[in-house]
C-alpha cells in the first residue's frame, strides 16, 4: 500500500506539496482569528501625549441568554471513527498492483471541481482487495464517483520537504454518480472484503473481475497453446472432478478456469489446438480406450486369442492380443460389438492362424492343464447328441454324490454341477425305470 500511496503522493504533489510558490491557497486553511488589545502611542509637536485608550467591549455573557440544547451523546463505535463521504471527479487513471502481503491495491485522486482551477482540491483515495480489482476495471478518468471510507495519514515521500502529511481515504464503498437527480449505481466488493457500518449491506450484481496476472496468463495460453493441456473434454466426460482446471500449463502447473477468461480470450479458444492428457487409472478412461481395442478385435481377429470357451478362472480375459498382451473381458464389451463377435472355437492345442473366411474367426489359446476341460466339453456334447447311450440317474440317485449321467459302454460319469451353461437347456427329459445296473 505504501508504494501506491507514495505514487499518489507524487501525482498530487503539485497541489498538495509544491505548487509554484510552495504555498497552498489561503482559502483552504482555517486560521483562528486573534484579537489583540493594544495601546497606541501618538507622537506629535515634540511632546508626548498620554497613550490613547482603546475601548474594548466586554464579551457577551452567554449565561444570561437562553440556554440551548446540548448535542446528544452517542455510543463510541470504532468502525465509524474518521468515517467520511466524498463526491468528486477522477483526476488520474487508476493505478493497480499487488503488495508484499499478497493483497491487491489500487489508487487514484478525486477533486471537487469549482469555477477556478486554482481552488481545486485533490484527495488521494485507496482501494483494497476485490474493490481494487473492480475500481481498476470500471473507474476511468473524468468519472464522477461517490466514495465512503476512513481517513488515514501517510507521511510524505523522502524527496518532498514539505512538512504537511498526506491525508488519504481508504475506500470501503464505491458508487458512480450519474446525475444530480438520478440514483447512483453502486459497485461493492464481496461482503468479506467490505467493512461497513450497515449490518447487512445490499448485495450488488457480481462483476467479472480479471486482474493483470490472470490476463497475462490467458495471453500466454492464446499465444502458446502447445505449452498448455486442455482438460475441457475430460471435465465434460466426467473423467476429472468438476472443479478441475480447464487448462493447465505443462511446466509449472499454472491453472486457468474458463470462468476467469476475458471475453477476447474466449473468442480465440475455438481456433486453437491443444494437447489433451487423459487421466490414468480411471474407469471411464478404460472404457474409452476399450472402444478402440474392441474395434481392433473385430477388424483384426487374427491378432487376438479367444479364451471364452476354456476359461478356468472367471477373472481370466476372454480375449488377449497376441503381441501387446492387451486383455478384454466380455463384461466390459460395448453393446455394438456383441453381434459381431465370432462363434466359439475349441479343441485347439496350440494357437494357429485361421483361414480368411467371410465369418469372423479367432485363434484359440488353450492354457496348459486345460485339455481335460476341453475333453469334458466333448463328453457333454456327446450326451446331448446321443442321449440313448447314457444312463440318466437324476431321478433315482441313491447316493447324492453319485453321477447324474453315466455312459453305458465306457462308464464315463457326468455331474449336473459341472455341466456347461449351454448344455443345461439341451439335456434330455427325465427318464424312469431304466433297465441298467444298480448304481452305487
Swiss-Prot record:
Phenotype upon loss of function: No visible phenotype.
Tissues expressing this chain: Expressed primarily in the female gametophyte and in the floral abscission zone.
Residue interval of the organelle targeting sequence: 1-61
Record-annotated SSB domain positions: 80-178
Compartment annotation: Mitochondrion; Plastid, Chloroplast
Region (PDF region 3): 380-428
Domain of life the protein comes from: Eukaryota
BP term (GO), one: DNA replication
Keyword Chloroplast carried by entry: yes
GO annotations of cellular component type: chloroplast; mitochondrion
Name of this chain's protein: Protein OSB3, chloroplastic/mitochondrial
Amino acid at each position: 500500500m505504501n508504494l501506491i500511496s507514495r505514487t499518489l503522493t507524487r501525482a498530487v504533489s503539485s497541489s498538495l506539496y509544491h505548487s509554484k510558490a510552495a504555498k497552498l491557497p489561503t482559502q483552504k486553511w482555517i486560521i483562528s482569528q486573534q484579537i489583540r488589545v493594544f495601546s497606541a502611542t501618538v507622537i506629535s509637536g515634540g511632546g508626548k501625549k498620554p497613550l490613547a485608550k482603546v475601548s474594548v467591549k466586554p464579551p457577551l455573557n452567554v449565561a444570561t441568554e437562553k440556554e440551548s440544547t446540548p448535542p446528544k451523546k452517542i455510543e463510541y463505535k470504532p468502525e465509524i471513527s474518521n468515517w467520511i463521504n466524498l463526491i468528486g471527479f477522477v483526476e488520474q487513471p487508476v493505478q493497480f498492483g499487488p503488495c508484499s502481503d499478497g493483497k491487491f491495491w489500487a489508487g487514484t485522486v478525486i477533486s471537487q471541481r469549482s469555477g477556478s482551477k486554482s481552488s481545486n482540491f485533490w484527495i488521494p483515495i485507496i482501494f483494497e482487495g476485490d474493490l481494487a480489482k473492480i475500481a481498476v476495471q470500471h473507474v476511468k478518468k473524468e468519472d464522477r464517483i461517490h466514495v465512503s471510507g476512513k481517513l488515514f495519514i501517510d507521511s510524505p515521500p523522502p524527496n518532498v520537504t514539505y512538512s504537511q502529511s498526506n491525508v488519504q481515504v481508504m475506500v470501503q464503498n464505491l458508487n458512480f454518480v450519474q446525475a444530480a437527480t438520478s440514483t447512483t449505481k453502486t459497485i461493492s466488493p464481496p461482503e468479506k472484503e467490505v467493512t461497513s457500518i450497515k449490518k447487512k449491506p445490499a448485495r450488488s450484481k457480481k462483476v467479472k473481475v480479471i486482474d493483470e496476472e490472470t490476463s497475462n496468463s490467458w495471453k500466454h495460453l492464446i499465444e502458446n497453446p502447445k505449452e498448455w493441456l486442455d482438460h475441457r473434454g475430460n471435465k465434460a466426460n466426467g473423467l476429472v472432478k468438476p472443479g478441475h482446471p480447464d487448462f493447465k500449463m505443462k511446466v509449472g502447473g499454472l491453472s486457468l478456469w474458463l470462468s476467469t477468461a476475458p471475453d477476447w480470450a474466449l473468442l480465440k479458444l475455438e481456433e486453437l489446438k491443444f494437447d489433451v492428457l487423459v487421466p490414468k487409472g480411471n474407469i471411464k478412461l478404460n472404457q474409452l480406450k476399450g472402444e478402440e481395442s474392441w474395434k481392433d478385435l473385430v477388424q483384426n481377429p487374427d491378432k487376438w486369442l479367444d479364451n471364452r470357451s476354456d476359461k478356468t478362472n472367471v477373472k481370466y480375459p476372454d480375449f488377449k492380443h497376441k503381441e501387446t498382451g492387451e486383455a478384454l473381458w466380455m463384461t466390459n464389451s460395448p453393446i455394438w460389438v456383441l453381434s459381431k463377435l465370432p462363434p466359439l472355437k475349441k479343441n485347439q492345442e496350440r494357437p494357429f492362424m485361421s483361414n480368411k473366411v467371410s465369418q469372423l474367426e479367432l485363434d484359440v489359446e488353450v492354457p496348459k492343464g486345460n485339455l481335460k476341460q476341453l475333453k469334458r466339453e466333448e463328453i457333454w456334447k456327446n450326451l446331448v447328441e446321443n442321449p440313448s447311450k447314457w444312463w440318466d440317474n437324476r431321478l433315482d440317485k441313491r447316493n447324492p454324490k453319485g453321477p447324474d449321467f453315466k455312459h453305458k459302454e465306457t462308464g464315463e460319469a457326468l455331474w449336473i454341477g459341472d455341466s456347461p451353461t449351454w448344455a443345461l437347456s439341451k439335456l434330455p427329459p427325465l427318464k424312469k425305470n431304466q433297465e441298467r445296473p444298480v448304481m452305487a
